[in-house]
Amino acid sequence: MTTFLNINQIRTTFIEFFKKYGHHHASSSSLVPGNDPSLFFVNAGIVQFKDYVRAPETSKYSRVVTCQKCVRAGGKHNDLESVGYTARHHTFFEMLGNFSFGEDNAKADFMQLIWNFLTKELFIDEDRLIVTVYHTDHETAKLWRSIAGLDDSRIIRIKTDDNFWSMGPVGPCGPCTEIFYDHGDKIPGGLPGTKDENGGRYVEIWNIVFMQYEQLNESTRVELAKRCIDTGAGLERIATVLQGVYDNYDIDLFKNLIANIEHLTKIKSVGEANFSHRIIADHLRASAFLIADGVMPSNDGRGYVLRRIMRRAMNQIHQLGCKEPVMHLLVQGLINEMGDFYKELRVRQELITYLLKNEEEKFKTTLSKGLKLLEEESKNLTSGSQLSGHIAFKLYDTYGFPFDLTQDILKKRSISINKTEFDQNMLEQQNRARQLWKGQGSNKEQLLWEKLKEEFRATEFVGYSLCQAEGIVVSLIQDNQYVEYIDINQVDDNNKEFWLITNQTPFYGQSGGQIGDIGIIKNNECTIHVTDTIKLFGCTHVHICKIVSGKINLNAVVHMAIDKQYRTQLQIHHSATHILHAALREILGNHIIQKGSLVAYDYLRFDVSHPTSISKDLLTKIENRVNEIILNNTAVKLRIMPFDQAIAHGAVALFEEKYGDEVRAISIGETSDARYYSFELCGGTHVKYTGDIGAFRILSESAIAAGVRRIEAIAGKHVIKQARQNSELLDLIAEKFSVTKQTIMSKIDGIIEENNLLKKQLHQLKYNQLILCEKDIQNMADNIGKIKLVYKNIEDYDLQIVRKAVSNTTKNIQNLVMVVISNNDKKSTIIIGVSDNITNKIQANNLVKEIINYIGGSGGGSATLAQIGCQYTSKLLDLKNIICKLLAT
């Protein structure tokens, strides 16, 4: 009989079972792939091991077991539209997997282990299991007969690519076999491979891929020298089997999440609301895990996919009638369910909560306007009809409605969207953006990059221990072309830069936030100034050079020397960045994630995830803590160690960085519990002791995106330089005001007080100049019938004074229309006042509308006081005549 296990128990049981049979447990990788730029998100267990598929001998372990976080929402693998409406679609899911790298005879053993796990460990009824194999894979069919005792009726041969996996047009490939669970005849559907296979009765619960071939070209396939096996089982699907349910949303995890949603929204998960609850529960998982792995909501890339997911859920919350943000209140319930295994959820809880609340608040401000437009444009559409793609694009462009959100809203009314029109609008917008971008590379440059990728050479970096070294010039590149030499006599007056690549170098190539070294390369024939060093493809150091004298030839032997003072400042700022990172985590919390950094010669910039601005007091506390670590003069130690060991010891790794099995770990200081104060994986250069940094000073803190703060700071001699400049500035100020440094503030306070008094007096003076009495009116007004018109042009007046003067004048004097034009910096403001006793005939706001029709601009107001703002125009010269005509009619 099948044993009931909750989802956490299944995950643990799976991992422990395969560990018992020689598998190394590898933690789930980040959802942001570090080794595959073609993927938005990790969508399968094999992704983090792709390099081992290509080169199995590089894997430290021959067998691995994982539970991998996956997201399918965007690009080729996009389940977003179906989520909530089917039994098994998710944006976020967990993939159980076990893998073999380079074992020649693991096939039978893997099949036996998987069958035993399902039938003997989980006690799944084997009579409910059937398998599929690729139609020519007789070996696997034979093994299923011997291992599981399956007869041919339960071994289904499939001819389609569903049962043959490949990495691409060329590369590793092989047949796969799938295990299906029969949910019984109460569920409609036929066997895999039949026309009714999509009915749902038979659900795939495990896929086993045997990578035993290599596709060389379209027609040639050969045996792989080293075979691999990739298996995957959806955790949610396994849970349905063990918990006796058919629908993934009925397993314990989702039942608990949906119960929380019911509690907060006060709406039961029945009828149409059931779809909403399922969407919210699924998208909550995806949003929280993406944020925990460093993705921030934005308008492009991964951040936009996250925003789409969040807004789709938030719209469902709105549809349930919730007026206030709700999604962030569900985070604690999710952490209660999944936070013990995925500790990053607990660490990033504050950030996840803040971003969900902030996004929902922002979205609510535009949601009602967008829904109003959508309702207006679709009110006459009937079931089966189509909304214009232009309207869908306007909703996207103006109100932040992702396409699939509009699609989701209309789905309930069986209305579709003209996707072709939407895509055309999107394409036109992208083309306009491209036309504004002036940095496109030439075809020649593109060809160079392609050739570099094909022929790149790894540069041996010797700069950790040496400041000088000999090297052989292996490439010279100028004007996007390979050249044999660079000659000072053939260089034009601009002395164009060129690229120089050597077999080894002491020059650090820009990476990990640290900018590249500068220095000199020379031999008996030439002297070259290195203005920068970059690193391509993760291993090729490219020196950006200008020739000073002589001629440099390909294959020449050169002496290379970095600028030691420049390197020292880079080391100082890099080590200071590590200490700053540790201080931020210590004082603000472990939710802090590094989002970017720049380590320069004269300053550092550090971007981190943090929900709110950092107060001045906290910045002072952080700065003091960094300086305290510096003054302790503790050792900065380098350790070369296995990646897993470094992570186990608490090393901080960047989410999007790709690490090898061996890593450089930089430790700084120790805490009372014998842990390092700072412990990070880092390929940069550092000081030997924190005292070498000297001092640290934060210059600024600001927001650069939702939930991302930027800190700029200086260290070392630059702190001393700034302190000296500040002191000299104080001396100048004290001298200017004939006071001591100690009394500068009281002097400034006195000046501010005096300035405020003078401002007040000036305002009163200008007000007195504008306020008019009956006698003034008689002398300066134009009489238009019984109406008196006062018309004035002024410059550089505070508009508040003008409004007050016009309002008070028209209140005190009857039958008056007062018009004042204030001109400031090519902009004009027109203030119009009308006496209350004539507003039955003339209204200030109506005069404004008529004037705007003539001169442009915008404005409004009341019957007695109104205002127009516009760019200065020559039409203003005739404005008095226009107003006279309006008053005369």
UniProtKB/Swiss-Prot annotation:
<dbReference type="Pfam" id="PF01411">
    <property type="entry name" value="tRNA-synt_2c"/>
</dbReference>
<dbReference type="GO" id="GO:0005829">
    <property type="term" value="C:cytosol"/>
</dbReference>
<keyword id="KW-0436">Ligase</keyword>
<dbReference type="InterPro" id="IPR018163">
    <property type="entry name" value="Thr/Ala-tRNA-synth_IIc_edit"/>
</dbReference>
<feature type="binding site">
    <location>
        <position position="574"/>
    </location>
    <ligand>
        <name>Zn(2+)</name>
    </ligand>
</feature>
<keyword id="KW-0547">Nucleotide-binding</keyword>
<feature type="binding site">
    <location>
        <position position="686"/>
    </location>
    <ligand>
        <name>Zn(2+)</name>
    </ligand>
</feature>
<dbReference type="GO" id="GO:0000049">
    <property type="term" value="F:tRNA binding"/>
</dbReference>
<keyword id="KW-0694">RNA-binding</keyword>
<dbReference type="InterPro" id="IPR009000">
    <property type="entry name" value="Transl_B-barrel_sf"/>
</dbReference>
<dbReference type="Pfam" id="PF07973">
    <property type="entry name" value="tRNA_SAD"/>
</dbReference>
<keyword id="KW-0030">Aminoacyl-tRNA synthetase</keyword>
<dbReference type="GO" id="GO:0002161">
    <property type="term" value="F:aminoacyl-tRNA deacylase activity"/>
</dbReference>
<dbReference type="Pfam" id="PF02272">
    <property type="entry name" value="DHHA1"/>
</dbReference>
<keyword id="KW-0648">Protein biosynthesis</keyword>
<dbReference type="GO" id="GO:0008270">
    <property type="term" value="F:zinc ion binding"/>
</dbReference>
<keyword id="KW-0963">Cytoplasm</keyword>
<dbReference type="GO" id="GO:0045892">
    <property type="term" value="P:negative regulation of DNA-templated transcription"/>
</dbReference>
<comment type="function">
    <text>Catalyzes the attachment of alanine to tRNA(Ala) in a two-step reaction: alanine is first activated by ATP to form Ala-AMP and then transferred to the acceptor end of tRNA(Ala). Also edits incorrectly charged Ser-tRNA(Ala) and Gly-tRNA(Ala) via its editing domain.</text>
</comment>
<dbReference type="InterPro" id="IPR018165">
    <property type="entry name" value="Ala-tRNA-synth_IIc_core"/>
</dbReference>
<dbReference type="InterPro" id="IPR050058">
    <property type="entry name" value="Ala-tRNA_ligase"/>
</dbReference>
<dbReference type="InterPro" id="IPR023033">
    <property type="entry name" value="Ala_tRNA_ligase_euk/bac"/>
</dbReference>
<feature type="binding site">
    <location>
        <position position="578"/>
    </location>
    <ligand>
        <name>Zn(2+)</name>
    </ligand>
</feature>
<protein>
    <recommendedName>
        <fullName>Alanine--tRNA ligase</fullName>
        <ecNumber>6.1.1.7</ecNumber>
    </recommendedName>
</protein>
<comment type="similarity">
    <text>Belongs to the class-II aminoacyl-tRNA synthetase family.</text>
</comment>
<dbReference type="InterPro" id="IPR018162">
    <property type="entry name" value="Ala-tRNA-ligase_IIc_anticod-bd"/>
</dbReference>
<dbReference type="InterPro" id="IPR003156">
    <property type="entry name" value="DHHA1_dom"/>
</dbReference>
<keyword id="KW-0067">ATP-binding</keyword>
<keyword id="KW-0479">Metal-binding</keyword>
<keyword id="KW-0862">Zinc</keyword>
<dbReference type="GO" id="GO:0006419">
    <property type="term" value="P:alanyl-tRNA aminoacylation"/>
</dbReference>
<dbReference type="InterPro" id="IPR012947">
    <property type="entry name" value="tRNA_SAD"/>
</dbReference>
<dbReference type="InterPro" id="IPR018164">
    <property type="entry name" value="Ala-tRNA-synth_IIc_N"/>
</dbReference>
<dbReference type="GO" id="GO:0004813">
    <property type="term" value="F:alanine-tRNA ligase activity"/>
</dbReference>
<feature type="binding site">
    <location>
        <position position="682"/>
    </location>
    <ligand>
        <name>Zn(2+)</name>
    </ligand>
</feature>
<dbReference type="GO" id="GO:0005524">
    <property type="term" value="F:ATP binding"/>
</dbReference>
<keyword id="KW-0820">tRNA-binding</keyword>
<dbReference type="InterPro" id="IPR045864">
    <property type="entry name" value="aa-tRNA-synth_II/BPL/LPL"/>
</dbReference>
<dbReference type="InterPro" id="IPR002318">
    <property type="entry name" value="Ala-tRNA-lgiase_IIc"/>
</dbReference>
